[in-house]
Amino acid sequence: RTWTISDACGNTNTCNQTINVDDTGAPFITTCPVARVIEGCGTSSITGPDYSAVSASSTEAVFENGTNQGVTSDNCAVTSVTYIDVAVGTCPTVVTRTWTVSDACGNTNTCNQTITVDDTVMPTITTCAVTRNIEGCNTSAISGPAFSTVSAPSSEGEFENGTNLGVASDACGITSVTYIDVAVGVCP
């Protein structure tokens, strides 16, 4: 800016003023995205945006959408929204999503959102193992798997094999199969 100073006799003098306009204020995060609980099997169940263990680009619209419900602004403009996720545990998996909001001058602000992913739906048994009639005088005649009066490990294959014909499924996968037998009316 150039200033000109004049007196009554027409004499003038000028000077220059420098005005620096600089945005030094970080963007505002009025509301961090809300905590979310998702039914699922792990981080692959997270959308809006997808899980990312490395810094990933997003948008102000996604930060503020109906899923996340964050609120951000800047005295100039928000120019960048990124996030990075850190997952801990299984059943449930708890994800800490760190959002970073930036403006054109490189000012940033961050906040953390918690996303919990958990499988709360029990496995489905579509068909229980069929009734079997076995020739023999005691429980030692039972095979596939052997008779056990205490909880014993088995496998999905044994439950579903040609002898037992059971059918079971789970959206997150079946991780164990056990069985226990009770003998009723066995020949002496």
Give a label for each model feature:
Residues 1-188:
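Proline-threonine-serine-rich low-complexity tracts
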